[in-house]
Amino acid sequence: MSKNYHIAVLPGDGIGPEVMTQALKVLDAVRNRFAMRITTSHYDVGGAAIDNHGQPLPPATVEGCEQADAVLFGSVGGPKWEHLPPDQQPERGALLPLRKHFKLFSNLRPAKLYQGLEAFCPLRADIAANGFDILCVRELTGGIYFGQPKGREGSGQYEKAFDTEVYHRFEIERIARIAFESARKRRHKVTSIDKANVLQSSILWREIVNEIATEYPDVELAHMYIDNATMQLIKDPSQFDVLLCSNLFGDILSDECAMITGSMGMLPSASLNEQGFGLYEPAGGSAPDITGKNIANPIAQILSLALLLRYSLDADDAACAIERAINRALEEGIRTGDLARGAAAVSTDEMGDIIARYVAEGV
């Protein structure tokens, strides 16, 4: 008998509920085709939770997530709540506390240039023609954003500010293993990003990544300095499979990877802890300007579901089925408005229906 799984669904604000509806259509198709026993429960988060419960992350939402195998997250935020104190606004008051509560130390951001969408890539046509499929693995809880001491002191010409880059062995080991395990499900290559010619933290990073690599003889490892990596991503992104990055370097490179795909509406992300529990969400925002118009691109939310199936439920076949269905739809020229460029566009609902049907049919 197949295992029972439970997903906490947090649609959130803006286009979140609209695109989440499409992801759940696809989940229904997955359940039926693969005979998976998956249940869902919905919870308020972000602005919707502020309106209904007076806070962006109600205790009931946290409890619901604790009882789930994974969290499928929509998007939060909007002009309606911008007047609130920063720590009570939807983004800082919901998403960041969730990451902290569940000790989500790794962030996975796929960036793929889909066939037929080369015209949206800002790179030269000959570079875009080669395509690319990159997974950026970023460490989330260490590094210069959290290292101590940090602060400001002094005055006049002696006023100064300082931050500290700190990484512990265990932090590097666990994020490296995420990268190597991910590479085993892809094209078996990890490129570790550092600045080991200057930074002591990067020297330790490189040493430990080399140690972990011995556990994965089937995965090729390369090292690259961050400054060179930013250039190589523009020159030839097809050379990369998995990028392994510290918090700061991953913050930079994941956004660069996102930009060269040409559409934020296509980009999912996953944040994982050591137990495989994850929070899965689109990389884009709540897009209040198009909310309720049935024109939002739901693919990033649907791909976030695929990541959830792959990493938290260990259902790679189901994840691949979703990805194939999306590829098929795009190859057939099916586009939402953000990708149509004057051609006929389908609605949010129609795109969800098409992808769900293709999953069910096993295209």
From Swiss-Prot:
Cofactor binding, note field: Binds 1 Mg(2+) or Mn(2+) ion per subunit.
Annotated site (Important for catalysis): Y145, K195
Cofactor(s) demanded: Mg(2+); Mn(2+)
Main location group: cytoplasm
Role played: Catalyzes the oxidation of 3-carboxy-2-hydroxy-4-methylpentanoate (3-isopropylmalate) to 3-carboxy-4-methyl-2-oxopentanoate. The product decarboxylates to 4-methyl-2 oxopentanoate.
Gene3D superfamilies in UniProt: Isopropylmalate Dehydrogenase
Protein name: 3-isopropylmalate dehydrogenase
Family: Belongs to the isocitrate and isopropylmalate dehydrogenases family. LeuB type 1 subfamily.
